[in-house]
Amino acid sequence: MAEQKNPLTTPSPNADTTIVPAGSPHTHTEQPSGGHGGAFPPFESHTFLSQLIWLALAFGLLYYLMSKVALPRIEAILGNRAGRLSSDLTEAQRMKTEADAAGAAYEKSLREAQAKAQAIAQETRNSLSAEADAKRKTLEAELNQRLAASEATIRTRTTEAMGNVRAIAGETASAIVERLTGQAPDQASLNRALDATPAVH
């Protein structure tokens, strides 16, 4: 039967079995790992070159990815936005031009309508004035004719009345003379006496 070895007293085959006498200058005490005795690895000088190389590679890869993937997408987005803005500006300019043209056409139509209205009003005033003048002249001519006819009638009636008055006066004078003298006067003497009498107006 094989003898059992105590692991606490029997060294491991991989263990260093060199015995160092007490007080030897090679004697040292192991420090537990995890202490602050070593430097931070990124700050160790012998790793600077490799770190710079990896940093350059990382930046190069990042630049490549940005230039091939991200930047084209950003440029495409910016290009689409620029094209949309340009299209919107062009459309706005076109609409502004159309609005200006419509405003100018409206103002022109308004001016033409005002001119036509003024011309029609002036023509109407002229027509009414000419018609009024014609009516006034016609009325004046009619009134003048009536006035002339009235004056002629008055003169005729005055002449007739005066003739009647002369006849009445002659008859009256003849009756008076006959009453006073007992003899009727002759017609020639009576006419001379009537002619010598002033006419009463």
Curated annotation (Swiss-Prot):
The chain crosses the membrane at residues 47-66. It comes from the Bacteria. Residues 1-39 are annotated as: Disordered. Keywords: ATP synthesis, Cell inner membrane, Cell membrane, CF(0), Hydrogen ion transport, Ion transport, Membrane, Transmembrane, Transmembrane helix, Transport. F(1)F(0) ATP synthase produces ATP from ADP in the presence of a proton or sodium gradient. F-type ATPases consist of two structural domains, F(1) containing the extramembraneous catalytic core and F(0) containing the membrane proton channel, linked together by a central stalk and a peripheral stalk. During catalysis, ATP synthesis in the catalytic domain of F(1) is coupled via a rotary mechanism of the central stalk subunits to proton translocation. The lineage of its organism: Bacteria, Pseudomonadati, Pseudomonadota, Alphaproteobacteria, Hyphomicrobiales. GO terms for cellular component: plasma membrane; proton-transporting ATP synthase complex. Belongs to the ATPase B chain family. This is ATP synthase subunit b 2. The gene is atpF2. F-type ATPases have 2 components, F(1) - the catalytic core - and F(0) - the membrane proton channel. F(1) has five subunits: alpha(3), beta(3), gamma(1), delta(1), epsilon(1). F(0) has three main subunits: a(1), b(2) and c(10-14). The alpha and beta chains form an alternating ring which encloses part of the gamma chain. F(1) is attached to F(0) by a central stalk formed by the gamma and epsilon chains, while a peripheral stalk is formed by the delta and b chains. GO terms for molecular function: proton-transporting ATP synthase activity, rotational mechanism; proton-transporting ATPase activity, rotational mechanism. It is found in: Cell inner membrane. It holds the Pfam family ATP-synt_B. Coiled coil: none annotated. Residues 1-17 have a biased composition (Polar residues). CDD domains: ATP-synt_Fo_b. It is a single-pass membrane protein.
